[in-house]
Swiss-Prot record:
Cell compartments where the protein resides: Cytoplasm
Domain comment, as recorded: Consists of 3 domains; the N-terminus binds the ribosome, the middle domain has PPIase activity, while the C-terminus has intrinsic chaperone activity on its own.
This protein's encoding gene: tig
Keyword Chaperone: yes
Organism name: Thiobacillus denitrificans (strain ATCC 25259 / T1)
Record-linked HAMAP family: Trigger_factor_Tig (MF_00303)
Name the record gives this protein: Trigger factor
Stored PANTHER family: TRIGGER FACTOR CHAPERONE AND PEPTIDYL-PROLYL CIS/TRANS ISOMERASE, TRIGGER FACTOR-LIKE PROTEIN TIG, CHLOROPLASTIC
Domain of life according to the entry: Bacteria
Recorded catalytic activity of this chain's protein: [protein]-peptidylproline (omega=180) = [protein]-peptidylproline (omega=0)
GO biological process, one term: 'de novo' cotranslational protein folding
Residues covered by the PPIase FKBP-type domain: 162-247
Length: 432
Protein backbone atom coordinates (compact mmCIF):
# COMPACT_ATOMS: atom_id res chain seq x y z
CA UNK A 1 0.00 0.00 0.00
CA UNK A 2 3.00 2.29 0.49
CA UNK A 3 2.90 5.18 -1.94
CA UNK A 4 -0.40 4.33 -3.68
CA UNK A 5 -1.17 7.53 -5.66
CA UNK A 6 -4.72 8.72 -6.32
CA UNK A 7 -5.34 11.54 -8.82
CA UNK A 8 -8.20 13.74 -7.65
CA UNK A 9 -9.82 16.81 -9.19
CA UNK A 10 -7.50 19.44 -10.68
CA UNK A 11 -4.14 19.56 -8.93
CA UNK A 12 -5.27 17.55 -5.89
CA UNK A 13 -3.55 14.25 -5.18
CA UNK A 14 -3.67 11.66 -2.41
CA UNK A 15 -1.06 9.16 -1.30
CA UNK A 16 -1.51 6.23 1.09
CA UNK A 17 1.35 6.05 3.57
CA UNK A 18 1.86 3.07 5.88
CA UNK A 19 3.98 3.07 9.03
CA UNK A 20 5.04 -0.27 10.60
CA UNK A 21 4.00 -0.21 14.25
CA UNK A 22 7.02 -2.21 15.43
CA UNK A 23 9.47 0.25 13.84
CA UNK A 24 7.54 3.16 15.34
CA UNK A 25 7.56 1.66 18.84
CA UNK A 26 11.24 0.74 18.61
CA UNK A 27 12.16 4.36 17.87
CA UNK A 28 9.79 5.62 20.60
CA UNK A 29 11.42 3.37 23.21
CA UNK A 30 14.89 4.40 22.07
CA UNK A 31 14.09 8.08 22.48
CA UNK A 32 12.40 7.56 25.86
CA UNK A 33 15.53 5.80 27.12
CA UNK A 34 17.72 8.68 25.96
CA UNK A 35 15.32 11.14 27.55
CA UNK A 36 15.33 9.22 30.84
CA UNK A 37 19.08 9.83 31.21
CA UNK A 38 18.62 13.58 31.61
CA UNK A 39 14.96 14.41 32.22
CA UNK A 40 13.99 16.19 35.44
CA UNK A 41 10.86 14.80 37.12
CA UNK A 42 9.28 15.65 40.45
CA UNK A 43 10.37 13.20 43.14
CA UNK A 44 13.44 11.93 41.27
CA UNK A 45 16.99 13.13 40.81
CA UNK A 46 17.86 14.23 37.25
CA UNK A 47 18.32 11.14 35.08
CA UNK A 48 17.12 8.72 37.80
CA UNK A 49 13.42 8.51 36.97
CA UNK A 50 12.29 4.98 35.98
CA UNK A 51 11.49 4.43 32.31
CA UNK A 52 7.86 3.66 33.11
CA UNK A 53 7.43 7.07 34.78
CA UNK A 54 9.13 8.83 31.87
CA UNK A 55 6.86 6.97 29.44
CA UNK A 56 3.72 7.97 31.36
CA UNK A 57 4.66 11.65 31.31
CA UNK A 58 6.39 11.99 27.94
CA UNK A 59 5.33 8.93 25.94
CA UNK A 60 2.47 10.57 24.04
CA UNK A 61 4.58 13.55 23.00
CA UNK A 62 7.52 11.41 21.91
CA UNK A 63 5.23 9.06 19.97
CA UNK A 64 3.64 11.99 18.15
CA UNK A 65 7.07 13.41 17.34
CA UNK A 66 8.33 10.08 15.97
CA UNK A 67 5.14 9.51 13.99
CA UNK A 68 5.37 12.99 12.44
CA UNK A 69 9.00 12.50 11.43
CA UNK A 70 8.30 9.03 10.04
CA UNK A 71 5.35 10.23 8.00
CA UNK A 72 7.43 13.08 6.61
CA UNK A 73 10.24 10.70 5.62
CA UNK A 74 8.00 8.07 4.04
CA UNK A 75 5.97 10.74 2.26
CA UNK A 76 9.18 12.18 0.82
CA UNK A 77 10.20 8.74 -0.43
CA UNK A 78 6.81 8.23 -2.10
CA UNK A 79 6.99 11.68 -3.71
CA UNK A 80 10.39 10.83 -5.20
CA UNK A 81 9.09 7.49 -6.45
CA UNK A 82 6.22 9.16 -8.29
CA UNK A 83 8.37 12.17 -9.32
CA UNK A 84 5.89 14.67 -7.94
CA UNK A 85 6.39 18.43 -7.42
CA UNK A 86 4.51 19.27 -4.24
CA UNK A 87 2.82 22.66 -3.85
CA UNK A 88 2.30 23.68 -0.24
CA UNK A 89 2.19 21.13 2.59
CA UNK A 90 0.50 17.71 2.82
CA UNK A 91 -2.36 17.03 5.22
CA UNK A 92 -2.13 13.62 6.92
CA UNK A 93 -5.25 11.78 8.10
CA UNK A 94 -5.43 8.28 9.63
CA UNK A 95 -7.36 5.73 7.59
CA UNK A 96 -10.14 4.08 9.58
CA UNK A 97 -10.00 0.91 7.48
CA UNK A 98 -6.38 0.02 8.24
CA UNK A 99 -6.06 -3.59 7.10
CA UNK A 100 -3.38 -4.80 9.48
CA UNK A 101 -2.75 -4.11 13.14
CA UNK A 102 0.96 -4.31 12.35
CA UNK A 103 0.71 -1.11 10.32
CA UNK A 104 -0.73 2.36 10.76
CA UNK A 105 -2.06 3.73 7.49
CA UNK A 106 -2.51 7.39 6.64
CA UNK A 107 -3.70 9.27 3.60
CA UNK A 108 -1.67 12.32 2.61
CA UNK A 109 -3.68 14.94 0.72
CA UNK A 110 -1.80 17.62 -1.19
CA UNK A 111 -1.53 19.57 -4.43
CA UNK A 112 1.07 19.42 -7.16
CA UNK A 113 2.50 22.26 -9.22
CA UNK A 114 0.57 22.88 -12.44
CA UNK A 115 1.70 22.63 -16.01
CA UNK A 116 2.29 26.14 -17.34
CA UNK A 117 1.46 26.78 -20.98
CA UNK A 118 2.67 30.03 -22.54
CA UNK A 119 1.43 31.05 -25.98
CA UNK A 120 3.82 32.53 -28.54
CA UNK A 121 4.72 36.16 -27.88
CA UNK A 122 6.01 37.08 -31.34
CA UNK A 123 2.85 39.02 -32.24
CA UNK A 124 2.96 41.11 -29.05
CA UNK A 125 4.41 44.62 -28.69
CA UNK A 126 6.17 46.30 -25.79
CA UNK A 127 6.51 50.09 -25.73
CA UNK A 128 9.88 51.24 -24.42
CA UNK A 129 10.07 54.92 -23.32
CA UNK A 130 13.10 56.76 -24.70
CA UNK A 131 14.03 59.92 -22.79
CA UNK A 132 16.54 62.53 -23.90
CA UNK A 133 17.52 64.47 -20.80
CA UNK A 134 18.24 68.14 -21.40
CA UNK A 135 19.28 71.24 -19.50
CA UNK A 136 15.63 72.02 -18.77
CA UNK A 137 15.24 68.74 -16.87
CA UNK A 138 18.33 69.50 -14.80
CA UNK A 139 17.03 73.03 -14.14
CA UNK A 140 13.66 71.69 -12.96
CA UNK A 141 15.37 69.30 -10.58
CA UNK A 142 17.58 72.06 -9.22
CA UNK A 143 14.44 74.12 -8.64
CA UNK A 144 12.97 71.27 -6.61
CA UNK A 145 16.16 71.20 -4.53
CA UNK A 146 15.94 74.97 -4.10
CA UNK A 147 12.37 74.69 -2.86
CA UNK A 148 13.44 72.08 -0.34
CA UNK A 149 15.86 74.65 1.09
CA UNK A 150 13.64 77.70 0.81
CA UNK A 151 13.09 80.28 3.50
CA UNK A 152 10.12 82.62 3.93
CA UNK A 153 9.97 86.40 4.20
CA UNK A 154 7.04 88.63 5.15
CA UNK A 155 5.14 89.85 2.07
CA UNK A 156 2.81 92.87 2.04
CA UNK A 157 0.46 91.32 -0.51
CA UNK A 158 -2.36 88.82 -0.87
CA UNK A 159 -1.59 85.15 -0.24
CA UNK A 160 -0.92 82.96 -3.28
CA UNK A 161 0.01 79.36 -4.02
CA UNK A 162 3.29 78.48 -2.29
CA UNK A 163 3.01 81.20 0.38
CA UNK A 164 3.16 80.46 4.08
CA UNK A 165 0.11 81.88 5.85
CA UNK A 166 -0.16 82.34 9.62
CA UNK A 167 -3.73 82.63 10.90
CA UNK A 168 -6.26 82.02 13.69
CA UNK A 169 -9.35 79.96 12.98
CA UNK A 170 -12.58 78.84 14.61
CA UNK A 171 -14.82 76.12 13.19
CA UNK A 172 -18.34 75.03 14.08
CA UNK A 173 -20.70 72.29 12.95
CA UNK A 174 -24.39 73.12 13.30
CA UNK A 175 -23.33 76.12 15.35
CA UNK A 176 -21.37 74.08 17.90
CA UNK A 177 -17.55 73.94 18.22
CA UNK A 178 -15.82 70.60 17.63
CA UNK A 179 -12.55 69.01 18.74
CA UNK A 180 -9.63 70.38 16.72
CA UNK A 181 -11.80 73.12 15.26
CA UNK A 182 -9.98 76.04 16.86
CA UNK A 183 -6.39 77.24 16.53
CA UNK A 184 -4.17 80.27 16.99
CA UNK A 185 -1.04 81.24 15.07
CA UNK A 186 -1.51 78.21 12.84
CA UNK A 187 0.89 78.19 9.88
CA UNK A 188 0.55 76.31 6.60
CA UNK A 189 1.92 76.56 3.08
CA UNK A 190 -0.82 76.89 0.47
CA UNK A 191 -0.64 73.97 -1.95
CA UNK A 192 1.32 71.55 0.24
CA UNK A 193 -1.79 69.61 1.24
CA UNK A 194 -1.44 69.97 5.00
CA UNK A 195 -4.95 71.43 5.00
CA UNK A 196 -7.99 70.32 3.05
CA UNK A 197 -7.87 71.74 -0.48
CA UNK A 198 -11.00 73.87 0.00
CA UNK A 199 -9.51 75.37 3.19
CA UNK A 200 -6.28 76.23 1.38
CA UNK A 201 -8.17 77.86 -1.48
CA UNK A 202 -10.15 79.97 0.99
CA UNK A 203 -6.85 81.53 2.13
CA UNK A 204 -5.81 82.55 -1.38
CA UNK A 205 -6.21 86.29 -1.90
CA UNK A 206 -6.19 87.23 1.80
CA UNK A 207 -3.68 89.71 3.26
CA UNK A 208 -2.45 90.22 6.81
CA UNK A 209 -5.34 91.61 8.87
CA UNK A 210 -8.05 90.16 6.60
CA UNK A 211 -10.88 88.03 8.01
CA UNK A 212 -13.09 85.59 6.14
CA UNK A 213 -15.91 83.16 6.80
CA UNK A 214 -16.61 80.13 4.62
CA UNK A 215 -18.28 76.72 4.63
CA UNK A 216 -16.40 73.48 4.05
CA UNK A 217 -17.67 69.90 3.71
CA UNK A 218 -15.39 67.23 5.14
CA UNK A 219 -14.76 64.28 2.78
CA UNK A 220 -16.49 60.94 3.40
CA UNK A 221 -13.13 59.29 4.17
CA UNK A 222 -12.02 61.99 6.64
CA UNK A 223 -9.89 60.56 9.45
CA UNK A 224 -12.08 62.06 12.22
CA UNK A 225 -15.12 59.89 11.56
CA UNK A 226 -17.44 62.18 13.54
CA UNK A 227 -16.80 64.93 10.96
CA UNK A 228 -16.95 62.82 7.79
CA UNK A 229 -19.49 64.15 5.26
CA UNK A 230 -20.44 67.03 7.57
CA UNK A 231 -20.39 70.72 6.64
CA UNK A 232 -18.53 73.09 8.95
CA UNK A 233 -18.38 76.88 9.04
CA UNK A 234 -14.96 78.46 9.58
CA UNK A 235 -13.93 81.98 10.51
CA UNK A 236 -10.28 82.82 9.84
CA UNK A 237 -8.17 85.88 10.60
CA UNK A 238 -4.88 86.17 8.71
CA UNK A 239 -1.98 87.44 10.80
CA UNK A 240 0.88 87.21 8.33
CA UNK A 241 1.67 86.23 4.75
CA UNK A 242 5.19 85.06 3.93
CA UNK A 243 6.52 84.51 0.42
CA UNK A 244 9.05 81.77 -0.37
CA UNK A 245 12.65 82.81 -0.96
CA UNK A 246 14.73 80.33 -2.97
CA UNK A 247 18.48 80.14 -2.38
CA UNK A 248 20.59 80.95 -5.45
CA UNK A 249 22.30 78.06 -7.24
CA UNK A 250 25.82 79.07 -6.24
CA UNK A 251 28.88 77.62 -4.54
CA UNK A 252 27.24 77.66 -1.11
CA UNK A 253 24.22 75.82 -2.49
CA UNK A 254 26.44 73.23 -4.19
CA UNK A 255 28.43 72.65 -0.99
CA UNK A 256 25.19 72.15 0.95
CA UNK A 257 24.34 69.36 -1.50
CA UNK A 258 27.65 67.57 -1.03
CA UNK A 259 29.87 69.11 -3.72
CA UNK A 260 32.92 69.83 -1.58
CA UNK A 261 34.55 72.48 -3.78
CA UNK A 262 31.23 74.22 -4.49
CA UNK A 263 31.55 73.76 -8.25
CA UNK A 264 28.07 74.41 -9.68
CA UNK A 265 28.86 72.59 -12.93
CA UNK A 266 29.81 69.49 -10.94
CA UNK A 267 26.50 69.78 -9.12
CA UNK A 268 24.63 69.93 -12.43
CA UNK A 269 26.57 66.93 -13.73
CA UNK A 270 25.73 64.98 -10.57
CA UNK A 271 22.06 65.91 -10.86
CA UNK A 272 22.01 64.76 -14.49
CA UNK A 273 23.71 61.49 -13.53
CA UNK A 274 21.05 60.88 -10.88
CA UNK A 275 18.32 61.65 -13.40
CA UNK A 276 19.83 59.21 -15.89
CA UNK A 277 19.88 56.52 -13.22
CA UNK A 278 16.23 57.25 -12.37
CA UNK A 279 15.28 57.15 -16.06
CA UNK A 280 16.92 53.74 -16.39
CA UNK A 281 14.96 52.42 -13.41
CA UNK A 282 11.66 53.85 -14.60
CA UNK A 283 12.09 52.51 -18.13
CA UNK A 284 12.87 49.07 -16.73
CA UNK A 285 9.81 49.31 -14.47
CA UNK A 286 7.59 50.25 -17.44
CA UNK A 287 8.90 47.31 -19.47
CA UNK A 288 8.46 44.97 -16.52
CA UNK A 289 4.86 46.09 -16.01
CA UNK A 290 4.03 45.44 -19.67
CA UNK A 291 5.92 42.13 -19.75
CA UNK A 292 4.12 40.80 -16.67
CA UNK A 293 0.70 41.78 -18.03
CA UNK A 294 1.56 40.12 -21.33
CA UNK A 295 2.60 36.89 -19.60
CA UNK A 296 -0.62 36.85 -17.58
CA UNK A 297 -2.62 37.20 -20.80
CA UNK A 298 -0.65 34.57 -22.72
CA UNK A 299 -0.37 31.91 -20.00
CA UNK A 300 -2.72 29.11 -19.03
CA UNK A 301 -2.39 27.27 -15.71
CA UNK A 302 -4.35 26.01 -12.72
CA UNK A 303 -3.61 27.65 -9.38
CA UNK A 304 -2.75 25.47 -6.37
CA UNK A 305 -5.27 26.60 -3.75
CA UNK A 306 -2.77 25.87 -0.97
CA UNK A 307 -0.28 28.40 -2.40
CA UNK A 308 -2.99 31.03 -2.84
CA UNK A 309 -4.15 30.61 0.76
CA UNK A 310 -0.58 30.86 2.03
CA UNK A 311 -0.07 34.07 0.05
CA UNK A 312 -3.40 35.49 1.28
CA UNK A 313 -2.33 34.90 4.87
CA UNK A 314 1.13 36.40 4.25
CA UNK A 315 -0.39 39.56 2.73
CA UNK A 316 -2.85 39.82 5.63
CA UNK A 317 -0.06 39.60 8.22
CA UNK A 318 2.08 42.13 6.34
CA UNK A 319 -0.80 44.60 6.11
CA UNK A 320 -1.65 44.26 9.80
CA UNK A 321 2.00 44.79 10.76
CA UNK A 322 2.22 47.85 8.49
CA UNK A 323 -0.92 49.34 10.03
CA UNK A 324 0.45 48.85 13.53
CA UNK A 325 3.79 50.44 12.57
CA UNK A 326 1.90 53.54 11.39
CA UNK A 327 -0.05 53.81 14.61
CA UNK A 328 -3.35 52.58 13.18
CA UNK A 329 -5.50 50.87 15.77
CA UNK A 330 -4.88 47.13 15.72
CA UNK A 331 -7.56 45.14 13.92
CA UNK A 332 -7.93 41.63 12.53
CA UNK A 333 -8.25 41.65 8.77
CA UNK A 334 -9.90 38.92 6.74
CA UNK A 335 -7.55 37.00 4.47
CA UNK A 336 -10.35 37.00 1.87
CA UNK A 337 -9.61 40.71 1.31
CA UNK A 338 -6.40 39.66 -0.45
CA UNK A 339 -7.75 36.87 -2.69
CA UNK A 340 -7.33 38.71 -6.00
CA UNK A 341 -3.88 40.05 -5.15
CA UNK A 342 -2.73 36.65 -3.89
CA UNK A 343 -3.98 34.84 -7.01
CA UNK A 344 -2.17 37.30 -9.25
CA UNK A 345 1.09 36.98 -7.30
CA UNK A 346 0.97 33.18 -7.24
CA UNK A 347 0.10 33.02 -10.94
CA UNK A 348 2.98 35.33 -11.87
CA UNK A 349 5.37 33.47 -9.60
CA UNK A 350 4.58 30.15 -11.27
CA UNK A 351 4.87 31.64 -14.76
CA UNK A 352 8.22 33.27 -13.98
CA UNK A 353 9.57 30.09 -12.38
CA UNK A 354 8.63 28.10 -15.48
CA UNK A 355 10.31 30.60 -17.82
CA UNK A 356 13.47 30.77 -15.70
CA UNK A 357 13.78 26.99 -15.56
CA UNK A 358 12.88 26.29 -19.19
CA UNK A 359 15.22 28.95 -20.56
CA UNK A 360 18.05 28.67 -18.02
CA UNK A 361 17.73 32.30 -16.89
CA UNK A 362 19.32 31.90 -13.47
CA UNK A 363 20.83 35.06 -11.98
CA UNK A 364 24.62 35.28 -12.29
CA UNK A 365 26.91 36.56 -9.49
CA UNK A 366 28.14 39.50 -11.57
CA UNK A 367 24.55 40.47 -12.39
CA UNK A 368 23.61 40.41 -8.70
CA UNK A 369 26.63 42.52 -7.78
CA UNK A 370 25.81 45.03 -10.52
CA UNK A 371 22.26 45.39 -9.17
CA UNK A 372 23.55 45.90 -5.63
CA UNK A 373 26.03 48.54 -6.78
CA UNK A 374 23.27 50.30 -8.70
CA UNK A 375 21.10 50.37 -5.58
CA UNK A 376 24.04 51.60 -3.50
CA UNK A 377 24.72 54.61 -5.75
CA UNK A 378 21.72 56.38 -4.25
CA UNK A 379 23.45 56.57 -0.84
CA UNK A 380 26.31 58.65 0.51
CA UNK A 381 28.39 55.58 1.50
CA UNK A 382 27.82 53.10 -1.36
CA UNK A 383 30.55 50.68 -0.22
CA UNK A 384 28.86 50.27 3.15
CA UNK A 385 25.53 49.64 1.43
CA UNK A 386 27.10 46.91 -0.71
CA UNK A 387 28.45 45.22 2.44
CA UNK A 388 25.04 45.60 4.09
CA UNK A 389 23.44 43.59 1.28
CA UNK A 390 26.06 40.84 1.30
CA UNK A 391 25.75 40.41 5.06
CA UNK A 392 22.09 39.37 4.85
CA UNK A 393 20.84 36.21 3.07
CA UNK A 394 17.33 37.73 3.05
CA UNK A 395 18.50 40.90 1.30
CA UNK A 396 20.55 38.86 -1.16
CA UNK A 397 17.46 36.79 -1.93
CA UNK A 398 15.55 39.99 -2.72
CA UNK A 399 18.29 41.10 -5.13
CA UNK A 400 18.38 37.67 -6.77
CA UNK A 401 14.61 37.89 -7.29
CA UNK A 402 15.08 41.28 -8.97
CA UNK A 403 17.76 39.78 -11.22
CA UNK A 404 15.48 36.90 -12.22
CA UNK A 405 12.69 39.36 -13.04
CA UNK A 406 15.12 41.37 -15.19
CA UNK A 407 16.10 38.19 -17.04
CA UNK A 408 12.47 37.28 -17.69
CA UNK A 409 11.69 40.81 -18.94
CA UNK A 410 14.68 40.59 -21.31
CA UNK A 411 13.45 37.19 -22.51
CA UNK A 412 9.96 38.56 -23.17
CA UNK A 413 11.46 41.54 -25.02
CA UNK A 414 13.43 39.12 -27.23
CA UNK A 415 10.26 37.17 -28.05
CA UNK A 416 8.04 40.21 -28.66
CA UNK A 417 8.51 43.39 -30.70
CA UNK A 418 9.88 46.36 -28.76
CA UNK A 419 8.86 49.81 -30.03
CA UNK A 420 10.80 52.85 -28.83
CA UNK A 421 8.51 55.72 -27.86
CA UNK A 422 9.90 59.24 -27.44
CA UNK A 423 8.94 60.35 -23.94
CA UNK A 424 9.68 63.44 -21.88
CA UNK A 425 11.17 63.07 -18.43
CA UNK A 426 8.00 64.49 -16.84
CA UNK A 427 5.84 62.00 -18.77
CA UNK A 428 8.01 59.12 -17.61
CA UNK A 429 7.72 60.30 -14.00
CA UNK A 430 3.94 60.70 -14.32
CA UNK A 431 4.06 64.48 -13.90
CA UNK A 432 2.94 65.55 -17.37
Amino acid sequence: MQGNLEVLEGLARRLDISVPVDQLETEVQSRLKRLARSVKMHGFRPGKAPLSAVARQHGAGVRQEVLGETLKTRFGEAVQTHQLRIAGYPRFEPKADASAAAEMTFSASFEVYPEVKIDALDSATLNRPVVELGDADVAKTLEVLQKQRRTFATAARAAAEGDLVKFDYQGTVDGAPFEGGRGEDFAAVIGEGRLLKDFEQALVGLKAGDSKGFDLTFPAEYAARELADKTAHFEVQVKEVQAPVLPPVDAEFAEALGVEDGDVEKLKAEVKSNLEREVKRRVQAKLKEQAMELLLQKSTLDLPRSLVEMEMDRLRRMTEADMQSRGVQSMKLSADMFTGQAERRVRLGLILAEIVQANKLAAQPEQIRSLIQDQAQSYEEPDQVVQWYYQSPERMQEIESLALEENVVAWVADQATVVDVATSFDELMGRA
